[in-house]
């Protein structure tokens, strides 16, 4: 067993897999595991695995022990991650409450919502708080200027600020794409499916407050789009892959329940609305507590529009009658069929196959849980990029260390890098330098005076 295979097995174990770890422990280089986990922003999650090993494999650890100095360093970092999570949770709850009190519906994207799916929500390395606000760009900018300290920069999809020392991004919309056709389709999809996301309220751990987070049905599309965007920007890391693994596992449980009589299609609408999952499945490929903390509550004053109940364009094509809709819900595969159609419509189908390959190779996702067939060729490329670049591409050594260069040099190195991807993803790769150039001049034009 080589190092990287052992690392992948250890990640699965840290997420709750019950496979035998004796052979993995025997060949594990603990210092290399620490370096890998640090590069991929997974130190907290991996330390959870080490603590579990101490309880389940004490004799094996005696034969290949973790050095005391390394263990203490790792433990200290994990405690720091826990404290960071507690602070970010508190600020996320405060920010959500403040926005709602000021009459702005919103939801927290990725981040602390994703952490709730982990076996230990405090083990995920936190980042900034991304909050999607249900208002026009003008209203959000006017509000932000009154409530926050802003820099002079503005981006197409968000404003950057901070609250109580925690970086915050106020989103006009969740994500963008480089290709203008797919970007327009994506924004239409966001608008059609927005309403339920702002009313899907969950509780943060230890009384930190309540926030709205997107539904699993929304996340399975949105977070894949986020991965796709960052793949062409500076790269993605294993932390984002694990986030998406948990989303896919949660989605599988949701659509398996889609034949439940309590789940129905609204009359006069083609949109299917699954209930948020509430309990673990016990499957070895997903932690049993995957969805346990997602305690849905009443989401405030807005009512859920029939056209915004979780997926856009959900009907089986050519048949929207109420009678046929009931027949559609009798199949547990309906939601998967719909999502696959959305992936193709939004230009995500090939990338979805690559991600499924990575989830299978690294985390053992079984074929029956996949949202698309594995694409081995594109998947191997994606996995190589993840392993080389680390968290958001911060550790790239190829492409001229492009993430560590100045703006001018990085501009051309990014183009050079993305030309490597043209034969795999031509629409997005060829559009990337055009979009980035346009975005630069757009930012200059809209820069705060």
Can you say where each PLM-predicted feature lies in the sequence?
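Conserved NTP-donor binding/palm subdomain of two-metal-ion nucleotidyltransferases/polymerases, i.e.
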Residues: 1-127, 132-257, 333-449
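Intrinsic disorder/low-complexity segments
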Residues: 257-334
């Amino acid at each position: 067993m080589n190092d990287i295979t052992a690392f992948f097995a250890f990640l699965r174990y840290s997420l709750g897999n019950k496979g035998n770890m004796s052979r993995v422990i025997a060949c594990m280089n603990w210092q290399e595991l620490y370096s890998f986990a640090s590069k991929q922003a997974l130190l907290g999650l991996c330390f959870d695995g080490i603590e579990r090993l101490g309880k389940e494999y004490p004799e094996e650890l005696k034969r290949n022990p973790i050095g005391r100095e390394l263990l203490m360093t790792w433990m200290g970092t994990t405690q720091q991650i826990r404290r960071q999570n507690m602070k970010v949770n508190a600020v996320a709850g405060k920010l959500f409450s403040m926005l709602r009190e000021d009459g702005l519906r919103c939801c927290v994207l990725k981040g602390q919502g994703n952490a709730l799916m982990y076996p230990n929500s405090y083990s995920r390395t936190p980042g900034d708080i991304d909050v999607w606000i249900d208002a026009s760009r003008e209203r959000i900018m006017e509000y932000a200027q009154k409530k926050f300290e802003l820099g002079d920069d503005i981006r197409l999809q968000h404003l950057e600020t901070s609250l109580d020392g925690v970086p915050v991004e106020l989103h006009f919309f969740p994500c963008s794409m480089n290709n203008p056709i797919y970007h327009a389709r994506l924004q239409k999809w966001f608008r059609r499916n927005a309403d339920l996301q702002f009313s899907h309220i969950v509780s943060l751990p230890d009384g930190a407050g309540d926030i709205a987070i997107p539904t699993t049905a929304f996340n399975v599309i949105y977070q894949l789009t986020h991965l796709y965007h960052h793949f062409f920007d500076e790269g993605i890391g294993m932390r984002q892959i694990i986030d998406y693994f948990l989303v896919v596992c949660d989605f599988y449980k949701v659509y398996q329940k889609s034949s439940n009589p309590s789940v129905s299609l609204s009359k006069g609408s083609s949109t299917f609305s699954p209930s948020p999952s509430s309990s673990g499945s016990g499957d070895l490929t997903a932690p049993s507590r995957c969805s346990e903390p997602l305690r849905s509550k009443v989401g405030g004053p807005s009512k859920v529009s029939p056209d915004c109940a979780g997926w856009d364009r959900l009907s089986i094509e050519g048949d929207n009658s109420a009678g046929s809709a009931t027949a559609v819900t009798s199949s547990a595969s309906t939601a998967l069929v719909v999502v696959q159609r959305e992936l193709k419509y939004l230009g995500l189908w090939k990338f979805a196959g690559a991600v499924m390959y990575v989830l299978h190779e690294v985390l053992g996702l079984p074929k029956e849980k996949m949202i698309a067939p594995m694409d081995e060729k594109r998947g191997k490329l994606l996995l190589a990029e993840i392993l080389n670049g680390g968290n958001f591409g911060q550790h790239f050594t190829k492409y001229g260390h492009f993430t560590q260069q100045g703006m001018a040099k990085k501009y051309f190195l990014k183009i050079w890098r993305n030309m490597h991807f043209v034969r795999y993803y031509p629409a997005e790769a060829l559009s990337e330098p055009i979009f980035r150039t346009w975005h630069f001049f757009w930012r200059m034009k809209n820069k705060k005076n």
